[in-house]
């Protein structure tokens, strides 16, 4: 690629340009493969020194490679419009990648400046974020259950936040925040640096209008669309407050505590073995599409699932789609709780999405962030329908529907309020506010979110330092709200149209990252700039609550 630099002129013939673009693509593929190997190894055990050393060395190598190839991006961004459009027209599957480079043109710096930023990230903020992961992954938690004190990982502890016993739920949350609060000075300082780094680069150097505007531009979403989504979510906080009032009556509580919002309605939660969970998820996909189920099976056939919790293992769950043609890798922490089954369905949905887009270049393979949750949330809904279809007991059906609403709250309103907090946090840190002031602001936002429907305990003011997305990917979480409300609309169409819906759904997934979210969804008849579209998702949620209100309260 460097050898061809002298050929990069505004009048370069299209075949020569495409040959250089192909080399650029090969470099990107090798970089992704190496980076993925290091991250997957690190995820197995975040305390593994060999994995840490490899990741650190690779970071340096990949930054150096990125900096050597940086001239290509900058040259293309700097072309006159007519010359750039001529090359875009001949670029085939890479078209949207090149259009995206042009979209970022106003926010791009000179080549020496971009090199400095890449080096700064690798040795600065990226290292700090890795430090956050290392610190939090080694936390252990002590919880007394039935007279026995258990030593737990965070994922194991969180299972007790859905325990049938109110005192166990409360103790689990209190222990979570006790440990994080004890480390809050360090964790909040890391977040402070994350915000200041973002502000320095995105506002002072690149001149985005607002901190969130940088993420919106990367997502190819206008600020106005994201603001509309967030304000519609905010104005519908009462929908979930209504649900929490209903759930309090079901649990025979005068008022729901924040400890109780994910409480099961039954005193004995059903447990699942991993094999049983896999069978259920695959069966739900098979009922929808044999092709989709076949893609999901590849993850298991190729042993690309790491499901067992263990000390040092990265918490949570993710799916890593590395390259077109490679079966994605999935990490979960399966503890046998009912919630772990839809988590598996969710991550398999991501894997299916990646495999559906395998015909694309590595440069246009990954779905844009706003659409990245489409197949994952859709997979959860397919699983719910399967479980409801197999269950005739009205009490169990009610519990399943309540579980859906619990998860919908967690995916829609909770995530929207996370982003609303981030918007404020970036402003407050820029104004020099303290950690305690940030925590107080977060707690006040929780009060707005829950209203008078939920009693808040003081320790929840520290919830924000537990949210890894704030550290890893600022302003990420509205994508969950976007994805869930979008899927509610798509799933309504699937129920109405049956098999006729499949080609349209497949097309959305098969686009990968080869077109803008607005373009992909417009082909499905969806206008993401219309507040009525987002309100329609809340109307579906409200209708589900109405259905539940018509059921008898469990005795």
Predicted regions and their residues:
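Helical catalytic core of nucleic-acid polymerases
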Residues: 354-403
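Short pre-active-site segment immediately N-terminal to the catalytic Zn-binding motif
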Residues: 269-274, 324-345
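A well-structured
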Residues: 1-267, 551-555
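C-terminal, non-catalytic "cap/extension" segments appended to globular domains
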Residues: 91, 97-109, 202, 220, ...
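Catalytic zinc-binding patch centered on the HExxH motif and its immediate surroundings
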Residues: 206, 270-272, 306-327
